């Protein structure tokens, strides 16, 4: 005669357990940091990415590291006057680093520069090198950050090496050389947040010039490095140098500036950058399906190491105002 009561109690226990599990699952889902890509919400791929997101939101640590008074600014001085002394400014015309990605099929060459969509453009040029192989691999352009699908296949370190490999004339030809350029301040803030905030400080003496989260310290030390390398008093280069040295030092622009077409970087690529790139792709007779694939990657998918719009980016940009 106790069976109905026992059954009811058993059912109640099961319902309580299910409800508890549901609450735990919902709580875990809500508590996970997420990254937004257009209207899609995507959880971080790894625990490392979750830790990176936490660092990008840790404003208390950033404020504490930058609580000092900024050095006084020079007023009423033009860039021309400021750089009139040889040892004050770095030379404009200097070769530092060139990383070219080639699509022989469409006679396209793109020079990638760190913090100017280098990962995404590396993916785009690899896709144009062999659309079928890239599509069949199931990769996205963001995957190029960790492993390059076209490593040692379509990569060159000088414009002359590309010319020699494909017998390209030294005058204007049907080959298209391009480079994405970015506002220097925007590029600096993005690079600083990427290298000095997002990435865990594993080497306190070397990484970010040993300055941690202190941007003023970093700028002063990187300026010293820039001047030392400018006048060949120092030859050792760091990842920081690659991310912060002038864009015009890249891509052999000191000798081949007139051969390049420039695409203006934008945090909203749909408004400026993509129309320019699409016009170039059409000019080089890239099929509409391939253009659509590239647009989808560039417009609706975000690089996993992008720092745009994060509290860290907003804070460090405010230090300029």
Swiss-Prot record:
GO cellular component: membrane
Segments crossing the lipid bilayer: 11-31
Membrane topology listed for this record: Single-pass membrane protein
GO molecular function: chondroitin 4-sulfotransferase activity
Keyword Ribosomal protein: no
Lineage: superkingdom: Eukaryota
Compartment annotation: Membrane
Pfam families: Sulfotransfer_2
UniProt KW keywords: Membrane, Transmembrane, Transmembrane helix
BP-aspect Gene Ontology terms: positive regulation of response to oxidative stress
Family the entry assigns: To C.elegans C41C4.1 and C18B2.2.
Protein's name in the database: Putative sulfotransferase vep-2
Organism: Caenorhabditis elegans
Classification lineage: Eukaryota, Metazoa, Ecdysozoa, Nematoda, Chromadorea
Gene that encodes it: vep-2
């Amino acid at each position: 005669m106790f069976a109905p009561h026992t059954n009811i109690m058993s059912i109640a226990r099961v319902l309580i357990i299910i409800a508890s599990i549901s609450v735990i699952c919902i709580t875990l889902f809500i508590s996970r940091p997420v990254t937004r890509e257009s209207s899609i919400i995507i959880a971080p791929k790894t625990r490392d990415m979750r830790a990176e997101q936490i660092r990008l939101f840790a404003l208390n640590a950033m404020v504490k590291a930058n609580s000092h008074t900024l050095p006084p600014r020079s007023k009423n001085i033009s860039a021309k006057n400021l750089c009139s002394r040889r040892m004050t400014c770095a030379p404009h015309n200097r070769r530092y680093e060139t990383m070219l990605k080639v699509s022989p099929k469409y006679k396209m060459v793109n020079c990638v520069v760190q913090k100017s969509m280098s990962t995404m453009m590396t993916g785009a040029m690899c896709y144009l090198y062999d659309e079928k192989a890239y599509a069949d691999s199931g990769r996205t352009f963001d995957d190029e950050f960790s492993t390059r699908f076209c490593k040692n296949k379509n990569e060159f370190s000088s414009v002359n090496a590309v010319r020699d490999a494909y017998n390209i004339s030294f005058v204007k030809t049907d080959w298209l050389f391009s480079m994405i350029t970015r506002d220097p301040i925007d590029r600096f803030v993005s690079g600083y947040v990427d290298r000095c905030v997002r990435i865990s400080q594993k080497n306190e003496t070397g990484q970010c010039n040993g300055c941690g989260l202190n941007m003023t310290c970093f700028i002063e030390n990187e300026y010293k490095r820039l001047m030392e390398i400018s006048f060949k008093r120092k030859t050792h280069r760091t990842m920081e140098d690659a991310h912060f040295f002038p864009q015009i030092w890249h891509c052999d622009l000191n000798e081949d500036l007139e051969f390049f077409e420039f695409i203006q970087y934008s945090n909203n690529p749909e408004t400026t950058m993509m129309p320019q790139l699409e016009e170039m792709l059409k000019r080089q007779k890239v099929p509409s399906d391939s253009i659509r694939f590239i647009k989808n990657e560039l417009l609706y998918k975000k690089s996993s190491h992008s720092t745009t719009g994060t509290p860290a980016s907003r804070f460090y940009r405010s230090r300029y105002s």
